[in-house]
């Protein structure tokens, strides 16, 4: 990879900004100042800016605690999007949400620029689970439990895969739902089959990775390599 491209991707700057860094002698390769942007780097090379080593990251993976009222999209002409919440932290990255939450739903949204990984966790054949806390307007019933376990057939005839549902509150109004597929407004439509309405929906986990409880609504952080791997373990 060319040095100027490496700088643009790791220092999160434009090519022109990278050129300025090089011209000012602020960039070193293996400890020696380098001012040539077309220098080809080897995997073993260490690049630093102002003495601070840079680490190349092919892809970015972010955990966001989505607040109510924000849409799960990269761009939107009317509403704030999940990508808007990241601001200018990754100007050279084309981030997008891997999966969606409704505008009024909250919780774990994964943002990345890794299309292959996003496809893997969303593909039904991969069976990557998503776990939700759902607030209902009518208590959970045994009929609902059994129906979810067998696979609900929606009003339009769509047959869904089996899902898990269990009560989290004594009155049965707060429940946990675990899905392994994604259909538009799926949870609301599933409960709608039984005449139950959804008053609140919060995504707690994707695969084996739970939402960081220290993240307030609207906050985000990068995932470690180990956390990215956890997503596909459940």
What is each PLM-predicted segment?
Residues 1-234:
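Basic, flexible Lys/Arg- and Gly-enriched helix-loop patches that mediate nucleic-acid binding at interfaces
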């Amino acid at each position: 990879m060319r040095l100027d491209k490496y700088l643009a991707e790791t220092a999160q700057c434009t090519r022109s900004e990278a050129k300025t860094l090089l011209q000012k002698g602020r960039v070193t390769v293996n400890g020696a100042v380098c001012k040539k942007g077309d220098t080809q780097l080897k995997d073993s090379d260490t690049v630093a800016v102002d003495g601070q080593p840079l680490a190349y990251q092919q892809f970015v993976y972010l955990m966001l605690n989505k607040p109510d009222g924000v849409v799960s999209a990269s761009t939107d002409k009317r509403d704030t999007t999940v990508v808007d919440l990241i601001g200018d932290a990754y100007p050279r990255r084309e981030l997008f949400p891997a999966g969606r939450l409704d505008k009024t739903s909250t919780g774990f949204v994964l943002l990345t620029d890794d299309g292959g990984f996003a496809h893997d966790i969303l593909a039904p054949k991969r069976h990557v689970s998503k776990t939700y806390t759902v607030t209902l307007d009518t208590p959970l019933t045994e009929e609902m439990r059994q129906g979810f376990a067998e696979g609900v057939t929606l009003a339009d005839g769509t047959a869904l895969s089996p899902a898990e549902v269990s009560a989290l509150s004594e009155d049965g109004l707060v429940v946990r739902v675990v899905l392994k597929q994604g259909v538009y407004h799926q949870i609301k439509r599933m409960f709608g089959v039984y005449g139950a309405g959804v008053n609140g929906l919060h995504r707690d986990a994707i695969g084996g990775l739970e939402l960081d409880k220290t993240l307030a609504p609207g906050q985000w952080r990068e995932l470690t390599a180990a956390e990215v791997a956890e997503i596909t373990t459940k």
